[in-house]
């Protein structure tokens, strides 16, 4: 008889729990607790620099009154503008409007921000927390959150040398590079340096000799063309034939080493030489086995 009573009490308890749990699962507070865990896992997966106590950070911006009677999932930002006045007032009393928006803002930052630092997230949330709770905010929420992202810091200057803004003078021809007789000299068929040697080709970033300054005597005037000017304006070599002037040599760019050059002693190649140089280190002779002087 006692065993039967214990079994009956267990059945009653299980039935009561089954009736109570679905009701708790429908409350906004339950949904927000689950959302906090999801946001913590999302932020953790993004490997944020300086991240500490992510759950405490999420809780700080997603507080809801425990007595909140609103049932349903966390509304999307745009749903607040079409929600009935009674539901909106109920959510506002619980502090759920601001908390719901903050939860969406954290997710938006995690997925779209470029600067993944805790300071950036903190400054973004402080900005979002000051948005007015008005329909325009609800309808343009993602745009406003994106505007709150901290600006991406500018990259450091690649080349600290000051490149002067000198005008490009006549070079190679009194008619200019693109003038009447720009195709000076003869170029050999199949030779690449006759027409194109782009100033942006393969090169180490610091190759240019920024102090080099060549000169060309054109129409009795000494016109200077420096490596800085060639790099600044990214001028291609057009139609100067197979020979290079001193200015072009100073401003020329050598290709980066290719893997096949690591064991070769003839250095980097010119554009008009073979791309893969010929091996010049002779092999070490290996004496035949089994030979003798007898």
UniProtKB/Swiss-Prot annotation:
Keyword Glycoprotein applies: yes
Signal peptide: 1-16
Keywords: Glycoprotein, Signal
Domain of life: Viruses
Record: glycosylation sites: 25, 162
Name of the protein in its database record: Uncharacterized protein 457L
Origin species: Invertebrate iridescent virus 6 (IIV-6)
């Amino acid at each position: 008889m006692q065993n039967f009573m214990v079994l009956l009490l267990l059945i009653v308890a299980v039935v009561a729990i089954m009736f109570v749990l679905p009701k708790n699962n429908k409350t906004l507070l339950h949904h927000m607790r689950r959302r906090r865990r999801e946001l913590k896992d999302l932020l953790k997966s993004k490997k944020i620099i300086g991240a500490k106590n992510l759950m405490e950070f999420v809780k700080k911006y997603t507080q809801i009154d425990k007595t909140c009677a609103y049932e349903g999932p966390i509304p999307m930002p745009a749903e607040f503008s079409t929600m009935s006045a009674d539901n909106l007032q109920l959510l506002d009393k619980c502090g759920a409007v601001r908390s719901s928006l903050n939860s969406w803002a954290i997710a938006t930052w995690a997925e779209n921000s470029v600067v993944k630092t805790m300071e950036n997230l903190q400054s973004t949330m402080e900005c979002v927390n000051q948005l007015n709770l008005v329909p325009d905010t609800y309808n343009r929420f993602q745009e406003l959150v994106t505007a709150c992202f901290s600006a991406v810091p500018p990259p450091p200057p690649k080349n600290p040398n000051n490149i002067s803004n000198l005008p490009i003078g006549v070079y190679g021809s009194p008619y200019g590079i693109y003038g009447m007789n720009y195709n000076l000299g003869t170029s050999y068929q199949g030779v690449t340096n006759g027409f194109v040697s782009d100033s942006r080709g393969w090169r180490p970033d610091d190759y240019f000799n920024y102090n080099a300054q060549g000169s060309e005597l054109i129409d009795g005037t000494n016109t200077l063309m420096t490596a800085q000017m060639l790099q600044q304006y990214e001028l291609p070599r057009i139609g100067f034939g197979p020979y290079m002037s001193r200015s072009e040599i100073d401003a020329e760019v050598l290709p980066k080493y290719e893997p096949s050059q690591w064991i070769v002693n003839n250095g980097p190649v010119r554009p008009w030489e073979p791309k893969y140089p010929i091996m010049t280190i002779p092999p070490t002779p290996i004496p035949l086995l089994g030979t003798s002087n007898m």
